[in-house]
Amino acid sequence: RAAMAEFYRLTGRRYGLIESHQMEDAEYAILAIGSTAETAIGSIDHIRAHEGIKVGVVAITSYRPFPAVEIVTALQHVKAFSVLERLDIPLGPDNPLTTDIEASLAKAAMGSPGFPRLTTMPICYSGSAGLGSRDVTAGHMVAVARNMAGATQGKRYFTLGIDHPLALTVEEEPDVRPAGSFSIRGHSVGGYGSVTTNKVIATMIGDIFGFPVQASPKYGSEKKGLPTNTYLTTTKEGKILTHSELQQVEFVPLMDPTTWNMGNPCVGLQEGGAIFQHTDVEEPQRLWDALPIWAKYFMVDHHIRFFGVDTVRIARACCKSDDSLIQRFQGVVLLGVFLRVTPFKAEAGMSDDALFSKVEAPLRKYFGKKGEAVVADNLRAVRMGYEEVFEVPRAIMEATPAAVLAKGKEEWDAKGKDVNAFFI
């Protein structure tokens, strides 16, 4: 505790050995460490409101020394609790954190000095989550709460995120982002510079508009030439607590038009959202006509805005200093598209000149070492993407024959809804 107090004095950030969230009236609790605990914290408002389960979270900050008394104090009035750990040790009685918590409760039940005396022993559930770097999601937290609070006793040991006899079923992925959030799920091909583009967009959102942002890619050299995704969320208020691939998004850029044949990029796109597609055609009607009819149905039905521009043409026109960078310049063009399509500039009341005076700083941060010519090329690519991207008019979309949209609905209903599955 003294060390935590000293840390607060030096940094202004206060941490306890544990951090309790909505435990005052909780009947059930989820205990975890790190990002798993943050995901649980971000999910409990939804669980309380939509599941009617009074659940709280105990985030464990210190594993050694173990905060036994603090944990027992937090759990002394709950009916049951679930411990989530990112490992599975089958040769032990339980996973390590679960074992320590059970031992702490046992010491309290035996009347050990310093512990609160327990009148009843809460039921302990233990789960393995995030194995093999898998995501832990809000949907998992809903399943954990249901497992504890169901009419029949749930699985005392369970897994999350893997196909296993002990796995809990996830029936939905609720949207637990803070109010006012804006999320992007990019679909690209490894080697197109999408990772760098995502980093630059994140930097621009923070530096230009002052919003907190979380960004992550599916990253790895093995992705080169293969379909991949990037993810980004920003919010004007609150804290982004979830750390997983995004389902609910407002903007979906497609850097490769063949993405329409390799999955379902429309999954989770919110009402009134936007899709951008690289295209070598310049007529909105031709871009619309080339879409699969299930995508047309979804866009018309959900009032999606649809944009396009030839990123390859712009990349070739702008990349004068190094021809080997042309492919990656397609991602730079997307920066301009992002600034045009998203609402941030308009909401900030910023002129084009003011905007582009601020764009140069993040570009220089990432490309400045390559020389002034490269920075200038990048800035030109961003501006051309911003100025030349075009929108398919709503009139063209709604002129689609009703019979085509009806057939598109049939295909949409039959189509897979897993954004990560290809060829569905």
PLM segments and residue spans:
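Glycine-rich nucleotide cofactor-binding loops and adjacent beta-alpha elements
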Residues: L131-T152, R156, G161-L168, V341-P343, ...
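Active-site phosphate/pyrophosphate-binding segments
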Residues: R1-E24, S133-R134, H140-A215, Y219-K224
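Thiamine diphosphate
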Residues: A3-D163, T234, F276-D280, R286-V300, ...
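Active-site cofactor/cluster-binding pocket
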Residues: P65-V69, A80, L84-R86, D175-I424
